[in-house]
């Protein structure tokens, strides 16, 4: 995966932003760190249902039994949300992903209070899809 900050650095960087315009710019910057997917990876089975923008997420198990993520979106802010979701789940086992309470992190980032309803719905769709796909890897 791209060089993304860990959750603590994400929270710290978010808190340093003076307003939500800066936070959106930071989210776009995070999304830009995700490498683009190939045409072969942009297949319907990798699309996330429930997102207004097109979002593709792929999962694979590495040799340390940790789940690795690659993903993309056709919208810059949504791609930043994909990166944030990956930051929360990176380096975790399937069970840790299934057990993680993401609402705590989203609360600390104040994400849901500042996203449009359709982006919030898409964010939840990403989490649901990742957990669903992760449960099939167990």
From Swiss-Prot:
Catalytic-site annotation from UniProt: 51 (cysteine persulfide intermediate)
Entry function: Participates in cysteine desulfuration mediated by SufS. Cysteine desulfuration mobilizes sulfur from L-cysteine to yield L-alanine and constitutes an essential step in sulfur metabolism for biosynthesis of a variety of sulfur-containing biomolecules. Functions as a sulfur acceptor for SufS, by mediating the direct transfer of the sulfur atom from the S-sulfanylcysteine of SufS, an intermediate product of cysteine desulfuration process.
Protein name (database record): Cysteine desulfuration protein SufE
Localization per Swiss-Prot or TrEMBL: Cytoplasm
Highest taxon of source: Bacteria
Keyword terms: Cytoplasm
UniProt main location, coarse: cytoplasm
InterPro entries: Cysteine_desulfuration_SufE, Fe-S_metab-assoc_dom
A GO-annotated cellular component: cytoplasm
Subunit description: Homodimer. Interacts with SufS.
A Pfam family this chain is assigned to: SufE
Family: Belongs to the SufE family.
GO BP terms in the entry: iron-sulfur cluster assembly; sulfur compound metabolic process
Pathway(s) served: Cofactor biosynthesis; iron-sulfur cluster biosynthesis
């Amino acid at each position: 995966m791209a060089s993304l900050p860990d959750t603590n650095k994400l929270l710290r960087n978010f808190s340093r932003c003076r307003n939500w315009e800066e936070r959106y710019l930071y989210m776009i910057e995070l999304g830009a760190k995700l490498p683009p997917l190939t045409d072969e990876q942009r297949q319907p089975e990798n699309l996330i249902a429930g997102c207004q923008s097109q979002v593709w997420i792929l999962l694979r198990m590495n040799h340390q039994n940790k789940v690795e993520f690659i993903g993309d979106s056709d919208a810059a802010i949504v791609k930043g949300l994909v990166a944030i979701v990956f930051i929360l789940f990176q380096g975790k086992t399937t069970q840790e992903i299934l057990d993680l309470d993401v609402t705590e992190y989203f609360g600390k980032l104040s994400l849901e209070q500042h996203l449009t309803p359709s982006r919030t719905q898409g964010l939840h769709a990403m989490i649901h899809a990742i957990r669903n796909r992760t449960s099939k890897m167990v």
